[in-house]
């Protein structure tokens, strides 16, 4: 990722597919002695710089890399990677809302905003205090990512992995009211939920690393492990497994597999039963193929579109890499829009590329 992202847990070099680069070791800052003040407005890659009002033709900011002819069914060889929006400190969790004429919502984790972008209206702040708020919800002395992270549609609204709120949130798309769905497991506060996905039965699966905490071993951390969880439709919370660095998460189109990107140990997959319970954990993509790995999306054909630090890499349902979309700033997440584009959360900006994939969305009653 970028310089700003070097403060995150960088588990590997900016790679898509290929030989492993050297691991970068990041030393976190010490916890402040007094509670932190609310973050100052940061509106661009340079502190105080206003976002750029991009208009078509959008500037190019990346390239498509074809590793296998099967990529042609998903992305044209001459597809352009366009920069449509900037002004983020750290973009995460993009989600497309509506049909072809809809809009994109994206978390700015360190600024505590959710940003809205559409081709017709451009960029605007959709929600301030998206995670940590003025009432101190989600406050911790060592909190460094006050905002939301992963975003999905579900339960009649927007479901957010609230890194700053240290909870899973439901945000009403009309009123923008936040409701905490869960913030504790067995009486102990969650670490900082990172990525989130909806299962076919309405279960919400999420990863919970301590990534939003400056001091990850400090007294505000109540769970002594990082985990992958399932929030059942009845709002009961179940621990699926403990992981070293849980991050991206996704569900297969038939609802029988749960995927997860854990950088230090490689990516894994579980089997899911009809009640959403996970079992039979096994390797999916070896650590030797991708070092690190961030958030991901699964399309309707079962292909995985995974942020692999410097790119979004496309994997077949069997875990074979067939191509990537690389950038010069790194990528944390992506989204398959209903407008025919794949959107990339690329550090300080949003990129897009024409794609033929269709977004996987379960119709949960």
Model-derived features: where do they sit?
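Low-complexity, intrinsically disordered regions enriched in charged/polar residues
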Residues: 8, 17-20, 58-61, 65
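Sequence-structural signature of mature extracellular/luminal beta-sheet repeat domains
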Residues: 30-365
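N-terminal export signals
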Residues: 2-3, 9-29
């Amino acid at each position: 990722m970028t310089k700003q992202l070097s403060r995150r847990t960088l588990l590997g070099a900016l790679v898509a597919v290929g030989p492993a680069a050297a691991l970068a070791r990041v030393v976190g800052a010490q916890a402040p002695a007094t509670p932190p003040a609310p973050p100052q407005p940061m509106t661009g890659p340079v502190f105080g710089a206003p976002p750029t009002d991009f208009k078509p033709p959008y500037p190019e900011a990346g390239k498509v890399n074809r590793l296998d002819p099967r990529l042609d069914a998903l992305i044209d060889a001459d597809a352009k990677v366009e920069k449509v929006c900037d002004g983020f400190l750290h973009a995460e969790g993009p989600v497309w809302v509506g049909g072809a004429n809809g809009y994109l919502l994206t978390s700015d984790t360190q600024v505590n905003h959710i940003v809205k972008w559409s081709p017709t209206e451009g960029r605007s702040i959709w929600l301030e205090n998206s995670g940590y708020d003025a009432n101190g919800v989600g406050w911790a002395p060592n909190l460094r990512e006050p905002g939301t992270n992963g975003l999905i549609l579900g339960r009649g609204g927007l479901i957010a992995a609230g890194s700053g709120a240290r909870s899973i949130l439901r945000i009403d798309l009309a009123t923008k009211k936040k409701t905490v769905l869960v913030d504790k497991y067995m009486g102990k506060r969650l670490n900082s939920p990172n990525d989130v996905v909806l299962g076919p039965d309405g279960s919400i699966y999420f990863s919970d690393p301590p990534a939003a905490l400056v001091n990850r071993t400090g007294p505000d951390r109540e769970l002594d492990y990082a985990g992958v969880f399932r929030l059942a439709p009845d709002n009961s919370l179940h621990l699926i497994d403990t992981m070293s660095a849980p991050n991206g998460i996704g569900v297969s189109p038939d609802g029988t597999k749960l995927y997860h990107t854990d950088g230090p140990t490689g990516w894994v997959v579980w089997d899911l039963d009809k009640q959403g319970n996970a079992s039979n954990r096994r390797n999916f993509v070896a650590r030797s193929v991708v070092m690190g790995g961030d958030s991901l999306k699964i399309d309707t054909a079962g292909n995985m579109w995974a942020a692999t630090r410097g790119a979004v890499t496309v994997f077949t349902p069997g875990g074979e890499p067939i191509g990537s979309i690389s950038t010069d700033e790194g990528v944390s997440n992506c989204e398959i829009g209903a407008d025919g584009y794949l959107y990339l959360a690329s550090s300080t900006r949003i990129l897009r590329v024409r794609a033929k994939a269709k977004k996987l969305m379960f119709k949960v009653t």
